[in-house]
Regions:
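Conserved PLP-binding active-site segment in aminotransferase class I/II-type PLP enzymes
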Residues: 1-67, 71, 75, 337, ...
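Conserved PLP-anchoring active-site segment centered on the Schiff-base-forming lysine
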Residues: 66-125, 129-131
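PLP-dependent aminotransferase class I/II
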Residues: 14, 39-44, 49-53, 116, ...
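Hydrophobic/aromatic ligand-binding patch that stacks against planar heteroaromatic rings
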Residues: 92-94, 148, 189, 233
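Active-site PLP attachment segment
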Residues: 175-209, 232-235
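Active-site phosphate-binding strand-loop segment of PLP-dependent enzymes
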Residues: 109-192
């Protein structure tokens, strides 16, 4: 059985292709390429879905973080805390602003940023902001982080690149008073046909500032900006896909539940069951006994036709461009070294799950 890590074929089925071709044809006929009605429609509906007041579309998820830092006035000489495990974009945005990243350790049960480590780093390094990551689609402990950061005036930007449809105890990711950044890269649960991103914000003032910066700083309040627009075709694709996202996320939760059930008694460790109904399950990670076991298992699954990937194979501090920064990340290093992600999509079948889990349980 051949099982791909991403299932684009079922996602972009014939019905969807027909509908999206009609929309793109409409955009071509109207000569509305840079921005248009679908940008505004998507911003309105995505904000509503995530419980936010405003959604500002931008060019990509990395820009979403960097512009958020800029809006908060964070730049040269400022220190920003990030979890030891995340995608390159989180730390790149900080470095692009001329700020200094400080590593914060993770909870070894789930890979999420640790509030206790956050408290230590806030006090030791005079952080101006932290960027907790809703990694894999899991909800980061935002309320606990706010209890640490708010009294000290430390800003929080939620990196929600993998969390379209994720729920905190208080509501959807994006419904807090923090800025929340999203990526719509083609592999995400809600994905464009190229690059696109967004920032969810609580106020119209922040919304307008983000949109101005992303449009070369042009507007009534002119400022230094950049080219970070989401083009009309990408916005149209996102608007169309938004119709199915809740249905598809529900299916992902069912897939994750079946994985949990079928992996009972195996040698891999699954994430806590408390996340089964709150995560968007962008990824389905398991923990192996060691990096060597992970490599062996990945090779075995590959031989049997199953595509896997080690998101993320290393902590940031172990990657050449990001070595030498201060902080703590020993648990992050251990977690990254043992993590393997199994295929998950809205279309993963029970038969595929059982096939994968039987291979895992055979070792």
């Amino acid at each position: 059985m051949e099982i791909s890590f991403y299932d684009f074929q079922n996602l972009h089925n014939e019905e969807f292709r027909k509908e999206i071709k009609e929309i793109i044809g409409e955009i071509i006929d109207n000569n509305a390429f840079a921005e248009g009605e679908y940008n505004h429609k998507f911003e309105k509906d995505f904000a509503k879905m995530q419980g936010a007041n405003y959604c500002a579309l931008v060019g990509n998820g990395t820009d979403a973080i960097e512009i958020s830092l800029e809006v908060l006035g964070i730049g040269h000489g400022d220190k920003v805390g990030i979890p030891g495990i995340t995608f390159y974009a989180t730390i790149e945005a900080i470095l692009n602003r001329g700020a200094t990243p400080v590593y914060i350790d993770i909870n070894p049960e789930d890979g999420l940023i640790c509030p206790e480590s956050t408290k230590r780093m806030v006090e030791a390094h005079d952080l101006k902001a932290i960027i907790p990551v809703h990694i894999y689609g899991l909800p980061a402990p935002i309320a606990e982080l706010e209890a640490v950061c708010n009294p000290k005036g430390v800003k929080i930007i939620e990196d929600s690149a993998q969390a379209q449809g994720t729920f905190l105890p208080s509501g959807p990711v994006g419904s807090t008073n923090n800025m929340s950044t999203f990526s719509f890269y083609p592999t995400k649960n809600l994905a464009a046909f190229g690059d696109a991103g967004a920032v969810l914000v609580p106020s119209e003032e922040l919304y307008k500032k983000i949109k101005t910066i992303g449009n070369h700083g042009r507007g009534d309040d002119a400022m230094y900006g950049r080219n970070s627009r989401c083009d009309h075709i990408q916005a149209a694709v996102l608007y169309k896909k938004l119709e199915k996202i809740e249905e598809y996320n529900k299916s992902r939760k069912e897939v994750a539940t079946l994985y949990h059930q079928n992996l009972e008694g195996s040698k891999v460790k699954t994430l806590p069951t408390k996340y089964l109904q709150t995560s968007s399950w962008h990824l389905y990670p398991v923990q192996c006994e060691s990096a060597e076991v992970r490599e062996s298992l990945a090779n075995l699954l590959s031989e049997k036709g199953v595509s896997t990937t080690p998101f993320y194979a290393e902590a940031l501090s172990e990657m050449t461009p990001f070595k030498g920064h201060e902080g703590e990340d020993e648990k992050a290093k251990a977690f990254a070294g043992r993590t393997l992600c199994l295929p998950i999509s809205a279309f993963t079948t029970k038969e595929q799950i059982e096939y994968i889990c039987n291979i895992i349980k055979s070792v």
